Amino acid sequence: VCFSGLLLAACAPFAEKLRRFISPACTAGLMLAGALTVTVMQTNDYFAIGGEGNIVREMLASYVSKGFHPNWRGVLYGTITMVILITFPRKFKKASLTVRPAFLALVFTLLLNLWLNPSYMPTAIKEIGAIGRPQLLTFDAIGAAGSKALITGLICGAALWLQLLYLRLGDKDTERSDLVFGGVFNILISLLPGAFLPTKPVKKFKATAAALCFGAVMLALLFIPLAPYSARIPTASCAVVLIVGAWQSVKWGKLRAAFASPLTIVLFALSLLITLLTDIAVGTIVSAVIGAIFAGVKDSAARRSAAA
């Protein structure tokens, strides 16, 4: 996450040049594939099914083999979270800029979980557990396993960077400051686990500052006096936060551009299928490269035709 933030902020001066290599069809494919992947993988925690798998096809196969037997408490926590995430920003637009709906949803379901299960005992409903020290603040020696984990982290960071870059540069009104803010937020998230990144760029500095101050106070409370209680947050609620956030990040307008011609349809389908059928990090990188080549060739052809 920190690596993706550094890359995103570093790209700010080159925003206009990079925009030429962003394919709307590839953006649609990547965003839709990301939302579908998050939905399939996190449904396991939402319904407390107990499935196993690291990629979409493995998780779907696990659902088929084990059967779809949701736990009522998981459904309850997740559904309450979804209702808050969807209705709170619509009913309280100004307040939602400072107090994130995700924070309210997690607090509400935490209190409900403490009421239904006051004393911790192993159940089908998983809880997030104690929040450990941020990894960037640890200085353990890097061995062979650590090097492999570092390489994997860099690949995932690059994939996340491409997702964020496509998400932001896909909008014509995106400014350089949006990339800088997005990068800084990602760096803060890696340093302060539990911080919430807005799914859409925040344009108003006052709202951003208020949200940061509120988030800092809440994080301090979670880390110090309320740590034993914050560990009881149901993973079902966290799963729904990820699912809703993923679908809110989808640029639905780009889907129309994806069907503008047979070539864009092929590019959209390739981006979608590659990301769904492989590891999401590898799929994102491969799809982004294909999209950049297509967009670059198209841009060069347009320039040659304009010069002629």
Task: Name each model-derived stretch.
Residues 1-111, 115, 213-307:
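Membrane-embedded alpha-helical modules
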Residues 31-39, 130-143, 155-164, 238-251:
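Hydrophobic transmembrane alpha-helices of secondary-active transporters
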Residues 47-59, 120-135:
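Peri-membrane helix termini and adjoining interfacial loops of integral membrane proteins
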Residues 79-92, 124, 157-171:
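Juxtamembrane interface elements at the cytosolic ends of transmembrane helices
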Residues 102-121, 157, 187, 191:
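Selective recognition of specific alpha-helical transmembrane segments in multi-pass small-molecule
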Residues 134-150, 296-308:
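Non-transmembrane accessory domains of multi-pass membrane transporters/channels
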Residues 141-210:
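Membrane-embedded helical hairpins/re-entrant loop segments and their flanking transmembrane helices
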Residues 183-188, 255, 307-308:
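Cytosolic juxtamembrane regulatory segments of multi-pass membrane proteins
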